């Protein structure tokens, strides 16, 4: 490659270093990845991949827990009015990630909105929209969350199926059991359960039906659907632990303490023992021992 006044002119080289940086990133070798990216930024400032390299550098910074550095650099990058299209989407998505990591959710929302409008990739659009819904949900902006999950549902075939199904489940969590139309709810969920395309997500849908009956105190039906969710083999261990926990709670309310204890045991097996939830259930389970002894 020719070195013209300190900057190199060889379009293949920047691409090669970019691939190298990404390979190192995926091997969790973040410092060497950063070195390759910095090399591009210093040696090929005129590269047409420069924005892409800059976004990747901040992706690495975020993995190194340097959120403040990433935020500063990305904000500077976004002041450049030549950045557009996918680069604009990627930079904003990365900025949103940095803000989410440090729990500044409202600013993450603003960045994610730009990313979702700027991306040309439907899978990304669906993912960003879904995450946006989750952020609104976290901040208890329930109406915005509901509408945002509806956007994902309306994307239909343009979105990966999992986001559509999860969005239905998220909306279901907002269902008003006192005033809501329970018949319409059951009809909608039965239709989702019967749809062949949703087969890989029966764990999510059955769990939601379980919650629906659980909230209304219909214990037998709730247990039936939680068990169905357990039987639909799930990749989501937290969902599985939630099924066991909720069945355990029902048996507990029914004063069947021995059975409740077994379900709490199954819950604990699938939970991270460092979480607050684990400790809470463990305490409840340990307290049951005395009750079971006298049962």
Where are the regions a protein language model picked out?
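Acidic, polar-rich low-complexity tracts and alpha-helical solenoid repeat scaffolds
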Residues: 1-295
């Amino acid at each position: 490659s020719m070195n013209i006044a300190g900057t190199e002119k060889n379009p293949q080289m920047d691409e090669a270093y970019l691939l190298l940086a990404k390979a190192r990133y995926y091997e969790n070798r973040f410092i060497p990845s950063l070195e390759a990216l910095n090399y591009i930024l210093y040696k090929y400032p005129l590269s047409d991949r420069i924005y892409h390299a800059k976004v990747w550098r901040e992706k690495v910074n975020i993995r190194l827990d340097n959120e403040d550095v990433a935020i500063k650099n990305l904000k500077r990058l976004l002041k450049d009015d030549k950045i557009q299209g996918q680069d604009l989407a990627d930079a904003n998505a990365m900025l949103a990630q940095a803000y989410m990591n440090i729990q500044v959710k409202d600013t993450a929302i603003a960045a994610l909105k730009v990313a979702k409008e700027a991306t040309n990739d439907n899978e990304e659009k669906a993912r960003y929209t879904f995450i946006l819904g989750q952020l609104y949900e976290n901040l208890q902006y329930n109406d915005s969350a509901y509408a945002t999950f509806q956007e994902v549902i309306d994307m239909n075939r343009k979105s990966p199926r999992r986001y559509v199904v999860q969005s239905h489940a998220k909306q279901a969590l907002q269902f008003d059991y006192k005033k809501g139309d329970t018949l319409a709810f059951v009809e909608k969920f039965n239709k989702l359960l019967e749809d062949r395309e949703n087969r890989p997500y029966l764990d999510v849908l059955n769990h939601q039906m379980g919650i629906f009956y659980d909230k209304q105190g219909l214990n037998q039906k709730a247990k039936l659907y939680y068990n169905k969710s357990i039987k639909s083999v799930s990749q989501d261990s937290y969902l599985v632990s939630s099924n066991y926990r909720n069945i355990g709670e029902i048996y507990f309310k029914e004063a069947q303490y021995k059975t409740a204890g077994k379900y709490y045991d199954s819950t604990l097996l699938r939970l991270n023992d460092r979480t607050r939830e684990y400790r809470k259930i463990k305490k409840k389970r340990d307290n049951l021992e005395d009750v079971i002894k006298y049962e």
